[in-house]
Amino acid sequence: MISFFGKCVNNLYKSIYYLVTGRSRVSHVLAQAAAISYDSLLISLVIAFVSAAVIAIQVSKQFLMSGAEAYVGGSIAVVMIREIAPGFVALAIGARAGTAISAEIANMQVTSQVDAIKTLKVEPVGYYFAPRILAAAITVPMVVLIAELVGITGGLLVSNATIHLHPARYINSVWLWLSARDIYISLLKGFVFGVLIALVCATQGYETKGGAKDVGESTTKAAVLSTVYMLIADFLINLIFYL
């Protein structure tokens, strides 16, 4: 785990240097942005909506029984923005796009395509990693923001349908409870999670040796490692900003 973390840090440094020196093409970044976030947008929004709906079902009647139904909107908004949207979106993108990144680079490694890039005097880590890391860092926070809006809307619809909470009271509660700081931190989480998904999965794919069987094993390991690193990062961010 420690040696793998060191490889990730080294690959991140090479990728940043590759980007700073202007060797990464915009077309490559846009293609990776579409593959990483756009293709995962629908499933991310569905997860956000369903998650908010489940939370609304669980808390609405409890709040109603205690006469605190006016706080339903704020509670759902805070939970969605602080934790559910960034975490679930990152897990969805990691499961879909992260494993695809790992499988693609692992396949290139075992079929000697990476060696072919080296013969052209191109830095393979920068060439393969930089567009993916930049695309994930930019687009994952965007998906998180959209998921937050969808989740809050889902909570509104469910609370209105279950306890007949007026939308105005729901929205007023959201405005009272929500702060710009929470939104900024959720976007920071999206940025960090995006970088980790691309970096960890690409590194795992790049370290693959052997044949087709090893590609499959590497892809599975990439999904596990990216999830572990995201959970650790989530804990540290919460520890820094909310303790």
Residue ranges and their predicted role:
Residues M1-S27, Q204-G205, K209:
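Short, membrane-interfacial amphipathic segments enriched in basic
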Residues S37, L41, L45, I84, ...:
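Selective transmembrane-helix segments that form parts of the transport pathway or gating/packing helices
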Residues S37-F88, A92:
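Active-site cofactor/substrate anionic-group-binding motifs, chiefly glycine-
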Residues I47-S51, I93, A130-S159, V192, ...:
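Hydrophobic alpha-helical transmembrane segments that constitute the membrane-spanning cores
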Residues Q58-I81, E148-F191, V195, L199-T219, ...:
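Membrane-interfacial helix-loop-helix connectors in multipass membrane proteins
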Residues V72-D115, V200:
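Hydrophobic alpha-helical transmembrane segments of multi-pass membrane transport proteins
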Residues I105-A130, A212-V215:
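Short cytoplasmic-facing helical segments at TM-TM junctions of multi-pass membrane proteins
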Residues V215, K221-N238:
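Final/C-terminal transmembrane alpha-helix of multipass membrane proteins
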